[in-house]
Amino acid sequence: MEVSRGFAEAGALSPEQAASYLRYVKEAKEATKNGDLEQALKLFNLAKDIFPNEKVMSRIQKIQEALEELAEHGDDEFIDVCNSGLLLYQELHNQLYEYQKEGIAFLYSLYRDGRRGGILADDMGLGKTVQIIAFLSGMFDASLVNHVLLIMPTSLISTWLREFVKWTPGMRVKTFHGPSKDERTRNLCRIQQRNGVIITTYQMLINNWQQLSSLNGQEFLWDYVILDEAHKIKSSSTKSAICARAIPASNRILLTGTPIQNNLQELWSLFDFACQGSLLGTLRTFKMEYENPITRAREKDATPGEKALGFKISENLMAIIKPYFLRRTKEEVQKKKSSNPEVQLSEKSPDVGAICEMPSLSRKNDLIIWIRLVPLQEEIYRKFVSLDHIKELLMETRSPLAELGVLKKLCDHPRLLSARACGLLNLGAAKFSVQDEIEGEDSSDVDHIDQISDDTLMEESGKMLFLMDLLKKLRDEGHQTLVFSQSRRILNIIERLLKNRHFKILRIDGTITHLVEREKRISLFQQNKDYSVFLLTTQVGGVGLTLTAASRVVIFDPSWNPATDAQAVDRVYRIGQKENVVVYRLITCGTVEEKIYRRQVFKDSLIRQTTGDKKNPFRYFSKQELRELFTIEDFQNSATQLQLQSLHAAQRRSDKNLDEHIAFLHSLRIAGISDHDLMYTRDLSVKEELDVIEDSHYIQQRVQKAQFLVESESQNTELLMERQKMGNEGIWLREPVYQTKKKRPKVNKPQPQPSSHLPVYHTQEEISSLMASIIIDDLPKEDEKDLSRIKLNDTIPQDGRHPCVITLNDDFVTTLPKGCGDVEEIFPDSLSGMALQKEASQEGFMQESEQESPLASFNYLPSKSARVDLGPNLDQLEDDEVLHHCNPSPANPKTKEYQRPESNVSVIKIADDDLTAAHSALQDAQANEAKLEEEPLASSGQYACDFNLFLEDSADNGQNLSSQFLEHVEKENSLCGSAANSRAESVHSKACLSVDLSEEDDEPEEVVNVKIRRKARRIDSDNEDEHTFKDTSSTNPFNTSPFPFLSVKQFDASTPKNDISLPERFFSPKISDSINKSVNSRRSLASRRSLINVVLDHVEDMEERLDNSSEAKVVEDHLEEGAEESGDEAPEHTKEDPSRETLSSENKSSQLSTSKPGALAQETSPGDPEPLSDGQLVDSPQDEAMEAVNDYDTLVLHGKELKECGKIQEALDCLVKALDIKSSDPEVMLMTLSLYKQLNKT
């Protein structure tokens, strides 16, 4: 009723009034974006006087509330952070700890001094998140940055969003994450075209690096790219690192609590990314001049000369990286706090200045509990190490890593071995089936342990016996405990034993993919003391969580990587922990676990020496000792424990309660206890080691040579540019490549038989590298595999196919920005496309067209594995062969591009006589049509790097959070090819015959030539471009703003602009006093009243929400029609109903032919509720579209009548004309093919 009344009132307006109304609304929106709220209010009131409606009234109310809120407050006060020159909002500044202010000053010094990047490597739990948010607050307030890209693991998104809201409520923060491609794209466009922070994940970066690095088809330069948990790019050849380097950025900041986890090459990789190659030279030089001497010096059997050289080289390395690197440990911060006179002064005199005092951290005792193997474990361990047939029984490969994996399982629990191995080793009456071997870890787990009694499960493992007694004692004492393990099957056993003992437990592992559920369990554990145990996998639970309610941590099995275990411990030992923390690391005596621990100690000494934690830490073990992993030692006593006890026995920090607890631990039949936290408390005397070679100039010369080589490589501009162009950072620096493709000679190709899998073309190198990567289920893995070992063959077989199947142990795959082999899959986009391609290959007139525009279409498959023959040329199809058919995307009526919203897959079965009929009918009249059909649907690649990989999941594949994307994978990759349309300029505007048999989103997905593999997933990316720069006449519809005001300097509601044209209250505090004389109020986006900024954002974006209301839609559409009649000048935009596809091929080709190659078309994201704003006047009347629809229906009806009368040729003409208007009706398409078939027979 209200809608009809509003429509009637709008109908009463004259064309002049309608035009004035729309003009006022448009100008009011522009004023709002520019921050002039008074002018916006005035203009909205004028619009209301002409035509009052709910939409305008709502906007007026919002602006009035914002003005009132602003008027109530005076100026914000700002403070210079540590005299660095960066002004920070006072209230925010006063809530920061002193060391956090120093961190912000360090970040600003990088910007101020022209350094392009740096690493903030504070210990875990010291608030790196808060430091970054406060730094960005000051930078945005001073208008020094506009666009920031923040990349992090998926599990941390909610934490960052919560902290942004808490500290800087006025900052515009959006996420590029989630299943909705439209929403992701819209958020990215808002940040790129206005300003603010966009948050995304490493997986999203890998899948969408092109979209994140471009806007409207051009390179988009971010002011800052910030990586949290930056050790994800510790290897420069991982997918995360490669894609991150492809994002153009003026400045890069890395956040990590563990800058080195294994070796110094990881440190080089981080600095090479952060400083964009301008600090540590090339990897080869760094390895030779720095890594090798330092690593050798850390070994116990190093000569005095090697030790002295390593010491001096590490000192030199620290001096080089010092301006770019800041790391503080908890102990260092605590010591500084206790000796800081300013803090003590402020405590006595509160008026001196507000300094937020850091709370005291509790004591941490990190204990190593040396566990003896039970007789059963000891027996199996000895047999495995000594007997060949036992190795063959338990081993799937001869890889030494696999042997270590089996030995680690034996140390934890024999039931971790396969069901067959347990049965053959007489470990109870375990069932075994082939299915167990196929499905891996979890499938047989239930049957595997359900038949075993609790007592048996405990007695088979020394660790399990100790753990049950320990957890019972801790529960009785009222402590909450975290239990970490690398294996879900260990957690399954522990969970069952604890539940049977009536423990209240919670659990998080890789199978908990929903962030909401994770947050719920964490919150429950933090607030409810009844939950005494929290079970977590080290990979998932060890990153980004705060679990300070617990005061005890158990590491059930040690990791090869010392940082992994350290991160797990820091879930508890961080700011906010009020109780003393005790950590229990369970390690078995005389086994591979003890040697893994010794390896951890060796790595840790490297980290401490090179990052400055220790000048010269004590050398505990030699490299030779670390190599002896497979020797059998004393299972009753630990040599490592005895060695450490002799060094550190008297240094343990303890109290009466801890002493009593340690006495209890000794009563649990353990071999001994060591103190991990006392490691490296001893330093060697530097003088002692340097005396031997005090007079030698060799060391000094080596240090000078190393520094000279690194500096010369870093400062060599030509070398730097060459590295960038050869690598991924120069992907935007490369010149556009325009290659004239030659026609392929026509050859007689054999008809291929349908195969169950893709052929693989590998060199001997690749085969050996792939074989080397096959290891047993539960081996320790990095989160991302090094791609450098996997080379994809660039050789293309003569039949035109580009098959490549790589089997990897990995959870995901995507398109990389660097060329790693070129795989083109030729998919037909429609039935007519198939027929036309087939006859073209037979007649030879479409060879060039086929070669120029293969459809590089990528589709996700469901998680169940399949190998599919993806790329057969259509001339090779046999009779009744089933074709893998992709649903062609509907044409966007505004962009004239074919888009692909989701992968709708169907299977079409075509008899050969159908194709023959179509071929015969089209042979004479539609050669040009065939070419035109091919071109708009094909998507030329802009990046020559597409490939398909088959992936084999690891046993703990669920622990990688990227697995949660697999249920939405077809929605995650987004970049539509934009170059294809431009090639249609020279094509005759003829009719296109296209067939779409699947418009439904819920169409069942089917795949042909399927062969099931164990836990394999095929993940492909969406369409991408082949060449670096093709033609940008058609811009990417996902990269444009939902607003048309590109020429207007846009107001950022979150951050004031340094521009005299803006209202004074939005000025940065750094504006000169002469400008600020008329300022009513200055505000920071960190102030609480900056919530008004959010209101302004809502006003700006209101058309996207309110325009969904029927009244606003109908009334303003009516007003726009009236405005068109008035003849007022307006920008020309074609507006058609997106739900209809009335675009004829004539219109399409003419539109394309008139577009200029360099022109950037105005486009909108496909998900925007109202692509064109109210203020835009449109030209194309909807009557034409309605008329076209009517013509379409008439043509279809007439064609059916002619068909019934037997007039085949006339009926075919009508239906082809109908398909010119609307090409997506499957009924008409099939009818047309049927007529072609009949015509051919006659």
From Swiss-Prot:
Chain segments carrying region Disordered: 1103-1181
Cross-referenced SMART domains: DEXDc, HELICc
Gene Ontology BP annotations: cell division; DNA repair
Keywords carried by this UniProt record: ATP-binding, Cell cycle, Cell division, Centromere, Chromosome, DNA-binding, Helicase, Hydrolase, Kinetochore, Mitosis, Nucleotide-binding, Phosphoprotein, Repeat, TPR repeat
Gene Ontology cellular component annotations, sorted alphabetically: kinetochore
GO MF annotation list: ATP binding; ATP hydrolysis activity; DNA binding; DNA translocase activity; helicase activity
Comp. bias regions, Polar residues: 1141-1156
EC number(s) on file: 3.6.4.12
Entry's localization field: Chromosome, Centromere; Chromosome, Centromere, Kinetochore; Chromosome
Reaction(s) catalysed by this chain's protein: ATP + H2O = ADP + phosphate + H(+)
Keyword Nucleotide-binding on entry: yes
The Helicase C-terminal domain, residue ranges: 466-626
Positions carrying Phosphothreonine: 815, 1055
Repeat region (TPR), residues: 21-54, 1192-1225
CDD domains found in the cross-reference section: DEXHc_ERCC6L, SF2_C_SNF
InterPro entries linked to this entry: Helicase_ATP-bd, Helicase_C-like, P-loop_NTPase, SNF2-like_sf, SNF2/RAD54-like_C, SNF2_N, SNF2_RAD54_helicase_repair
Phosphoserine carried by residues: 14, 755, 773, 963, 989, 998, 1021, 1061, 1090, 1110, 1173, 1180
Subunit structure, as described in the record: Interacts with PLK1, which phosphorylates it. Both proteins are mutually dependent on each other for correct subcellular localization. Interacts (via N-terminal TPR repeat) with BEND3 (via BEN domains 1 and 3); the interaction is direct.
Sequence similarity: Belongs to the SNF2/RAD54 helicase family.
Name of the protein described by the UniProt record: DNA excision repair protein ERCC-6-like
Organism: Bos taurus (Bovine)
